[in-house]
Amino acid sequence: MTSIEELRVLPPLAVGRLGAAVEPMDNYTAETDPDQPLAPRRLRPAPTFRVDRTSGAITGVETPGELRFTDGQGKVRPVAPFLEVWALTDDHVLRPLTLDLLRLNGLTPGDVRWRVRVGNHKIQRRTYDDRDRIDADTEWFSDHAAHALNGLCPNFLEGRSLPLGHARYLQPTPGFPGVRLRFTPAGGHVYGSAYTDRPTDPDPNVVDFLYDATKGTWRGHADQAGDPRLTIPAQIYAGDDGPNGSWVSRGYLDDECDGLVHVKLEVSGRELTAFGRIGAGPPAYAPDSVPIRTVADELDQALSGPRATAGDTLEQARAVAEEVLRRATETVRLMNTEVMNGNTVDGRVDAASTMVRQDTADTGRLFEPIMAPSLVDTAAVLALHQNVLAALRSGTAPWFADVLRDHDEVGDLTAKGRRKMPALMRGADGRSLALTRRQVDLVRLAARQAIFRQDTDDPEVPR
Amino acid sequence: MPELFEDQAPAVAALSVAGSLGAEEKRPVLPPEFNWRDYTVMLLHVAAEIEHSLMVQYLFAAYSMGGPQVPEARRDDVRRWQEVVLGIAKEEMGHLVTVQNLLTALGAPVNLDREDYPWGSDFYPFPFTLRPFSATSLAAYVVAESPETWSGPKADEIKRVAFESTGQYVNRVGALYSRVDAILKDEEFLPDESFHAGTLPYQASWDEWGRGYTRGERGQDSGNVPDVKSPELLVFGVFSRDSARRALHEIGEQGEAPDADLEDETSHFNRFLGIYEELTAWPEGDQALVSRPVAQNPVTEHRLDESEVAALGVAEVTTSPITDPVTALWGHLFNLRYRMLLTDISHAFRLAGPVDNGGVLTGRGALVHRAFAEMYNLRALAGRLVDLPLERDAPDGPRAGPPFEMPYSLELPHHDHDRWLLQRDLVQASRLLTDQLLSTDPSCGGDPYLVALRESDQRALEQVEHILSRKGCTR
């Protein structure tokens, strides 16, 4: 039997990326070059759905000959993820929801109903004014038109809304019979705040004025020192120096968002529902690099717990250790380590927003570089990471578990604590970044185990 | 044993100078051909070689530990011990660079040399021997690091085992340091102006060399293995008589804890002793399985396989030639990277670090990082060598192990430009070896480590070429 019992939206979390080009970004993979294992990952074009703009149907699958991240006119191509509906049928199999499966249950694509709700609450997070919340809601729909995600906000200028992209229920066809929704993020623009009781100077940074700076407080807002509700660190918005060391907001808005994709289907008198999460972030300007701690790592930890489990093989643990090092190498490649370390730059002390500034501001401690200033020449640090990665590929046990920062060491401001890895980087709480507990534990597992191996050992034996 | 203290007139050659710790109230006597400053420098040269050779022997022992033959129930212990021995070796590296700092502060050249076979000088604890980890080799380390006050039945027993395993009474490392201290503390021997504070920017600092290991924070868990404390890397800058004495005192204490309670777990002596007691409590059958079947003193040169009798009537030192052709290539690669490590350290001492917050950087930081990278390479290569056959056509015979052979010279060219030429030579030599390994042996074709090493050498070559092409590189 193939009676539909439950629904799922897969992937459960999809991250889009902003871009103003009309055509979304093609699919690609990032692979390690076996002949140059220390080099950045190579991007390889991958099979990509082509969607007919008129009908909303997938017309084919193409693997592009080359990858282009812009449309050639200076506009970035957005990453527009597909969300698929899967069904758990009465034989306990999770399978894609298709035209056939719908038909077997006496349903058509028109019976599938969608609703997308996204928001951008960045202003409200800082002003604590609920009228600064920006929300968009498509309401329920079953058609295949593009549904604009228009962000509405009580403190906007009359009749204005923030474009947050659009969602489209793709029309299933015999060739591509799956039930899918595509989320296309917004263009990646900066919007401004205008006064209604006085003239507003033009601003070359903004494409339009949306926010009513007379009605709301966002333009001219300054975080109040000592307020326990502040973001950590505070003052992370576009602004200018104000009186008494304050940081005064210019009233800018971006068009990022995140929210929920709901799907609903009535089967044999029962209403089945499911939802997935979507978000839109800035474009990937280093698409051949992976951050050292990703959402995927968080999900892995949520799924498997903070420790290595009995099911984790030594080989997996070693792979995690190597991946951590690879990402660290990719990250160093993108950093100006001399500046990030708090070295004097062209005679300037405190030349940028760094963990050194953070440590100094939070504790009143002396502005003190993190690593020995002689050690942070960017080329030398990059070479060091590449060398560690090379040595790790020999199969020797990772030896650097010692210097990984534990989750409960993020506030350790001793020299040893500040120098732990990942170094020079900030976590979400304004203190030094740490890997997930599970990442650290897997590296330690590999560190403990690897000396008993022999090259002939079967690598995939669970512990 | 003749002594160069005033109550015993000097009767023998200069190097026969082992004093005892209890001799603090005695005044050292100057041997012929020296003044006090030069004599101090000579003793520090010996100290550097001792620290260097202990470090290498401990590393060899640590690398030999483990292997598939270790019983499952024993693995946690073996991995823990290995971490302890590696930690002690790392601390010896700290001692080694601190001795270089002392030499630098006195205006003397650094010394990264190491006596190869044969072995002789009565300050050296025991004949230099690369041996797989075992209860008998461990006994020698316990005695070498022991405080003068260590006695009793247990001490006698371990000293007996050490004697049998080395063929001589094992000298205590501490004896040399107390001799140096007896000179340092006396203004008549070395006036204050002998200590050049201006050399500090050239000296190794903990901030550069400590790599996140503890500094004076005992008792932090190491992250690699549960219940093993992080090593405590001591790197002291020397800028005065007091700082010189403190550096030596701390090094001595970390070795043998002369002033500490014998139960103090922080000294090398107590850590080695603890492992010795745990290991000897095992059944003998299990004891024999703690290490891989690694040969003693593996060498890449095709010497005749015969015993060389070392000086001073010590035990015979037997070298084990690596005759398997592929293993020999790995051994040569190991020796070359060892040479690169010593060159990087030595080169780093020739360049000043920034005296402020690094507004202008020299190549020093890059050299320090390269030195650490070579340590990681040595670890990786040793991991290969303890798994590769020593002898041609004996695939199931003894394993090779890392040879740690000294280069023909450690001298650096006078001009910085020419030092970078040497660096380039070494990288190119490594490329030749890796290419040879990758192309000639099917078992190495596509070896992920060799492929990565080749690439990192290529990148290093580009960096060296960049330095050589810069106008800032002086001739």
Q: What is each stretch, according to the model?
A:
Chain B
Residues 1-475:
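Non-heme di-metal
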